[in-house]
């Protein structure tokens, strides 16, 4: 596996691959790699001749009171794991390489509407930072395919819309969430949880599954389902930002004839802000 840290070095490795018409899959990450990230890499290996991974803790997607300084950074461990999973190239830039203007972007990419709701309501500017850095990384790597975990479903939806609206020549692939045996979605922020909190955190997935089952069984009072799920989480010790049932395609409020739904949640447990979702496919022919 090659490791580069600058845009110039990245281009020097990618140019011969492009000249040879090698297909390229890209997995952007913020590091502290866990089994969910590595599943993205393994999936990428089945989709393309070359797999590029980036590790960059992007400062522009963190708010002023968020965990940028505390976010877990494990570069040596990450490199070992990527080698074991046979990634071809690791791009490991610093802020000055990604944002040459004093480590901050002078130009931003924003996806209005999608970016201000759900997590965007509680993390103002977050998705502007995400869209900007992902746009820059996609322009630098120019992959055929970029892979993102479905755990961050709103992020995935924002990126898909950005790529579509800007006519970017890349396919965006969502990959199902990898979970702990308890059902807890794997996340770098799980490191903030104590063993007891980690056990309790699986309540999010169980609660979302129960809500999804109610929808599949025919319940259509979505507001009541959301309220009951929120109450369950609050009773379990969480501070809930939201539980919301939306249309998968664009995260709009669902109508009666929508069959592809998603129920999303964000809640705090101790120091950790946890997000999760469950996809719902309804049989509208019945």
Swiss-Prot record:
Record has Ligase as a keyword: yes
Binding site for ATP: 30-37, 149-152, 178, 186-189
One Gene Ontology cellular component annotation held by this UniProt entry: cytosol
UniProt superkingdom: Bacteria
Catalytic activity: (R)-pantoate + beta-alanine + ATP = (R)-pantothenate + AMP + diphosphate + H(+)
UniProt cross-references to Gene3D superfamilies, sorted A to Z: HUPs (3.40.50.620), Pantoate-beta-alanine ligase, C-terminal domain (3.30.1300.10)
Binding site for (R)-pantoate: 61, 155
A GO MF term: ATP binding
One Pfam assignment: Pantoate_ligase
Compartments reported by the entry: Cytoplasm
EC number of this enzyme: 6.3.2.1
Note: The reaction proceeds by a bi uni uni bi ping pong mechanism.
PANTHER family: CYTIDYLATE KINASE/PANTOATE-BETA-ALANINE LIGASE, PANTOATE--BETA-ALANINE LIGASE
Full protein name: Pantothenate synthetase
């Amino acid at each position: 596996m090659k490791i580069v840290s600058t845009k110039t070095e990245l281009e020097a490795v990618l140019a011969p691959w492009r000249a040879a018409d090698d297909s390229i899959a890209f997995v952007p990450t913020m590091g502290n790699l866990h089994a969910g990230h590595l599943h993205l890499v393994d999936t990428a290996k089945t989709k393309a001749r070359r797999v590029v991974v980036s590790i960059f803790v992007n400062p522009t997607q963190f708010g002023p009171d968020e965990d940028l300084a505390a976010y877990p950074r494990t570069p040596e461990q990450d490199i070992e794991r990527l080698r074991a999973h046979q990634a071809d190239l690791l791009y490991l830039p610093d802020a000055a390489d990604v944002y040459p203007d004093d480590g901050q972007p002078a130009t931003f990419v924003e996806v209005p509407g999608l970016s201000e709701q759900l997590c965007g309501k509680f993390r103002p500017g977050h998705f502007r930072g995400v869209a900007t850095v992902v746009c820059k990384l996609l322009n630098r790597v120019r992959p055929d395919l970029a892979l993102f975990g479905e755990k961050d479903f709103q992020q995935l939806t924002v990126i898909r819309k950005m790529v579509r609206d800007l006519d970017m020549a890349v396919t965006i692939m969502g990959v199902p969430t990898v979970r702990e045996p308890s059902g807890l979605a794997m996340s770098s922020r799980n490191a903030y949880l104590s063993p007891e909190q980690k056990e309790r955190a699986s309540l999010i997935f169980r609660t979302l599954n129960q809500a999804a089952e109610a929808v599949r069984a025919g319940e259509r009072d979505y507001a009541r389902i959301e309220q009951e799920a929120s109450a369950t989480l609050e009773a379990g010790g969480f501070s809930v930002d939201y539980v919301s049932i939306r249309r998968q395609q664009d995260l709009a409020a669902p109508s009666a004839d929508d069959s592809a739904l998603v129920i999303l949640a964000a809640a705090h447990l101790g120091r950790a802000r946890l997000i999760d979702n469950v996809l719902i496919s309804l049989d509208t022919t019945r």
